């Protein structure tokens, strides 16, 4: 038995459908608008998310673009992954200037 695994303690199971709702709420809080499974700001796609079995697949653009954006994919397997994705996107949104929007 190690200190990492205390007896009688286990993380709650990951529920991707509930995590998707949490992610959507977090992205709306960042000022993004949801359209057809994608999240936009000023008519430019910024992020997308979809449930695939036991995983939540999320992606964000490397830079905002009206044409075909480059995506950075990230599978979300836990509530912590969802929080990290939202926090990372928040930092990225702050770094992009208005001319990139």
Predicted regions and their residues:
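Charge-dense, helix-prone N-terminal extensions
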Residues: 1-101
């Amino acid at each position: 038995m190690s200190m990492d695994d205390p007896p009688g303690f286990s993380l709650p199971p990951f529920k991707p459908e509930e995590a998707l709702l949490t992610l959507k709420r977090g992205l709306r809080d960042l000022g993004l608008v949801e359209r057809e499974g994608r999240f936009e700001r000023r008519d430019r796609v910024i992020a997308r998310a979809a449930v695939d079995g036991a995983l939540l697949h999320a992606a964000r653009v490397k830079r905002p673009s009206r044409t075909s954006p480059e995506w950075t994919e990230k599978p979300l397997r836990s509530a912590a992954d969802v929080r990290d994705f939202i926090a990372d996107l928040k930092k990225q949104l702050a770094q992009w200037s208005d001319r990139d929007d």
